[in-house]
């Protein structure tokens, strides 16, 4: 009986020694893991913006890092989730360094209520979370956030009151359109289609115009568009009131808006 108790006592002591050793080495390993996040690189695709963020994981600890997950959630100023992106690494062995690219891809037309961000500047909140597991024994997580400004590509969009010039069969509607491109990412290269509809919703005139406004370069001078557009209209279908529909079409987005018109006299 005494031998059994002595063996149990030694087994308990050894178990506690191993447990303390494990805790010490795990803490040591945790403090010897370095995660360096580099400067994001920007890529513009046909219909999306991609931020590629380089991350370097230096595991100088005594255990492998398992199930490394980097997740980024982008929210608007009201806390609504706009998009989510994750990167996963199954193993970073001990005493090794691993390089990954964490990509955040934005397709404007897939963002909820994206058209509001085409004409209004705002701030986006970027929430990052990093989760990992030391030696398949101790899970850890790190959470941090940042804020980035969003510049609207059609900021301060202004559509002036239309005016008309008449002849025997047609009239020409003149319409001034202006805006500023506050986006450092989006090159506004596309078309602006203008349609004139009478009060019966009949299309009585249409014209298309090229637009080419470069992205904002950060020098305080916003690239601007300010043009007076001309649209031929069929006089026989012209009514005293109606509306003018404008459609911006680019590789990054499409945006449609309407303004009413009202004439004091037709002839």
Question: PLM features: what roles do these ranges have?
Answer:
Residues 107-154, 222-225, 231-267:
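Terminal connector regions
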Residues 155-202:
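Surface-exposed interaction/gating patches
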């Amino acid at each position: 009986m005494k031998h059994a108790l002595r063996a149990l006592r030694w087994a308990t002591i050894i178990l506690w020694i191993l447990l303390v050793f494990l805790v010490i080495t795990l803490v040591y390993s945790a403090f010897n893991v370095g995660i360096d996040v580099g400067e994001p690189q920007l890529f513009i695709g046909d219909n999306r913006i991609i931020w590629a963020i380089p991350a370097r994981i230096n595991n100088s600890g005594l255990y492998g890092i398992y199930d490394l997950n980097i997740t980024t959630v982008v929210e608007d100023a009201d806390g609504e989730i706009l998009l989510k992106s994750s990167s996963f690494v199954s193993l970073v062995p001990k005493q090794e360094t691993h390089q990954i690219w964490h990509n955040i891809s934005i397709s404007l037309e897939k963002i909820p209520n994206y058209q509001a961000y085409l004409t209004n500047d705002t701030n986006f909140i970027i929430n990052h979370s990093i989760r990992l597991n030391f030696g398949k024994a101790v899970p850890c997580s790190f959470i941090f956030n940042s804020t980035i400004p969003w510049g609207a590509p059609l900021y301060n969009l202004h559509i002036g009151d239309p005016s008309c010039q008449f002849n025997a069969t047609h009239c020409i509607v003149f319409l001034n359109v202006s805006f500023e491109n506050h986006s450092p990412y989006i090159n506004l290269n596309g078309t602006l289609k203008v349609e004139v509809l009478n009060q019966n919703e009949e299309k009585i005139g249409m014209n298309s115009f090229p637009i080419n406004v470069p992205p904002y370069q950060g020098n305080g001078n916003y690239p601007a568009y300010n043009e007076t557009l001309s649209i031929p209209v069929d006089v026989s279908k012209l009514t005293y009131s109606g509306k003018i529909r404008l459609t911006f079409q680019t590789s990054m987005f499409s945006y449609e808006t309407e303004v009413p018109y009202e004439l004091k006299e037709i002839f």
